[in-house]
Amino acid sequence: MSRVSDTFAETSSVYSPDHADIYDAIHSARGRDWAAEAGEVVQLVRTRLPEAQSLLDVACGTGAHLERFRAEYAKVAGLELSDAMREIAIRRVPEVPIHIGDIRDFDLGEPFDVITCLCFTAAYMRTVDDLRRVTRNMARHLAPGGVAVIEPWWFPDKFIDGFVTGAVAHHGERVISRLSHSVLEGRTSRMTVRYTVAEPTGIRDFTEFEILSLFTEDEYTAALEDAGIRAEYLPGAPNGRGLFVGIRN
């Protein structure tokens, strides 16, 4: 294995408590607007299924998108694998059920008019087969004519090898910095993210390692189509990587 592979060998896609604790603050400082992102999804759904009444947000994270979704749909639910992220979501939207589960094999036993998988969560799947498991499971939980929305990670031709970026957030009594460095290895991007948190009790830092698959547009589309979801790719918004929007046959 290469040095990069050795570093990432034990990487988990489940967010740690340290990461969950500062997630909203640092990504808000980076320009994320969850209400606006959710609003864009609502508009896309409205043009395809104006009568939609229920929505499931898989890999819902801290529940930031659910705050907007709950104002738009009669029935809203979330799904999250990380205990730390799920606990924040439960506090944020206590009236919304937040289920624990893996996006590849969860079973809620009921259909939804809309299912969203945002924040490039599908790219944490290591293989195309796992990506297809995700889309098949989404299709199983979609009502006929229901709408699926997936936000991808970068396509292989758009990824910048060696990309670095940074941000600083001032949040209450805390100052949080984030530095990241991403490299290409095979069909994946491997990102090292270093955080420093300064707070009244002192300064602490920690490092996260993230592996994200560089699936192609065709691979996402085929995974959706083969699951029985007619899909189209809409480039650009909300975060530069676009969205896949599909309707279940």
UniProtKB/Swiss-Prot annotation:
Name its co-factor(s): Mg(2+)
Origin superkingdom: Bacteria
User: What EC number(s) are associated with this protein in UniProt?
Assistant: 2.1.1.324
Reactions it catalyzes: dTDP-4-amino-2,3,4,6-tetradeoxy-alpha-D-erythro-hexopyranose + 2 S-adenosyl-L-methionine = dTDP-alpha-D-forosamine + 2 S-adenosyl-L-homocysteine + 2 H(+)
Indicate which residues the UniProt annotation says bind S-adenosyl-L-methionine.
A59, E80, D102, I103
Write out the entry's keywords from A to Z: Magnesium, Metal-binding, Methyltransferase, S-adenosyl-L-methionine, Transferase
A Pfam family hit = Methyltransf_25
Q: What does this protein do?
A: Involved in the biosynthesis of forosamine ((4-dimethylamino)-2,3,4,6-tetradeoxy-alpha-D-threo-hexopyranose), a highly deoxygenated sugar component of several bioactive natural products such as the insecticidal spinosyns A and D.
Q: What is this protein called?
A: dTDP-4-amino-2,3,4,6-tetradeoxy-D-glucose N,N-dimethyltransferase
Give the organism the record lists: Saccharopolyspora spinosa
User: What is the name of the gene encoding this protein?
Assistant: spnS
